[in-house]
């Protein structure tokens, strides 16, 4: 069957409006993607409905879900490791027991800020070109923390953002094919 890497966490980005967060959160005075108790109460409310539905779908319970994401590209947004830890702990509290991961750009500053490598949460990267260079940065980051984990590109970007009123961004097909070939040679494309 199909194995699933699930990204159910609070902020998913995925180029969705407001990163998938509900817009009504802006009506309440709170700091988003932080340990602000008002925000974390909303996270708890979300998780207490969603996560019990996902527990039986984990591979540890006979389902297809092999991994779940704690946060997406947090290192490009904030540096509050306590927020990442609280999110991880809530996931575990509600029964998530498959390997957890974070996903960030492949440069040291955002990996430092957006990962929980020190808590053994798997590190993945997001990129769509310069695969050898990005994989080397990730490998060096992991080695610095005593990890010999596989390199994994969680989001392989085959295009880029289009904005209203601007020309459509197109990527050359041969360029994309060459980049994918390079990533496959590195050995880790999700």
Which sequence ranges carry the predicted segments?
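Structured loop/turn residues at beta-strand edges in well-structured enzyme cores
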Residues: 63, 118, 186-187
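Structural motif
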Residues: 60, 115, 183-184
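Catalytic-core region of carbohydrate-active enzymes that cleave or remodel glycosidic bonds
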Residues: 2, 90-94, 130-190
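Active-site beta-loop-alpha junctions enriched in small/polar residues
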Residues: 9-13, 70-75, 103-107, 126-130, ...
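Active-site mouth of glycoside hydrolases
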Residues: 1-98
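Substrate-binding cleft/loops of secretory-pathway carbohydrate-active enzymes
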Residues: 75-96, 104-142, 146, 168
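Hydrophobic faces of well-ordered beta-strands that scaffold small-molecule active sites
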Residues: 4-8, 66-70, 100-102, 123-125, ...
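Short, hinge-like loop/turn segments at secondary-structure boundaries
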Residues: 21-26, 117-121, 170-171
């Amino acid at each position: 069957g199909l194995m699933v890497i699930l990204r159910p966490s609070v902020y998913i980005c995925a180029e969705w409006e407001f990163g998938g967060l509900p817009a009504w959160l802006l009506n309440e005075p709170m700091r988003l993607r932080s340990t602000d108790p008002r925000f974390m109460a909303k996270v708890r409310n979300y998780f207490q409905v969603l996560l019990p539905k996902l527990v039986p779908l984990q591979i540890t319970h006979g389902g297809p879900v092999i991994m779940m994401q704690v946060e997406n590209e947090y290192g490009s947004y904030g540096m509050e490791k306590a927020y990442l830890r609280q999110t991880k702990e809530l996931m575990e509290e509600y029964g998530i027991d498959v390997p957890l991961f974070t996903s960030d750009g492949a440069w040291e500053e955002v990996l430092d800020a957006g990962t929980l490598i020190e808590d053994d949460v798997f590190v993945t990267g997001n990129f769509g070109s310069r695969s050898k260079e990005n994989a080397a940065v990730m490998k060096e980051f992991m080695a610095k923390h005593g990890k010999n984990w596989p390199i994994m590109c969680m989001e392989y970007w085959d295009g880029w953002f289009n904005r209203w009123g601007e020309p459509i961004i197109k990527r050359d097909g041969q360029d994309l094919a060459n980049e994918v070939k390079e990533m496959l040679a590195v050995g880790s494309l999700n």
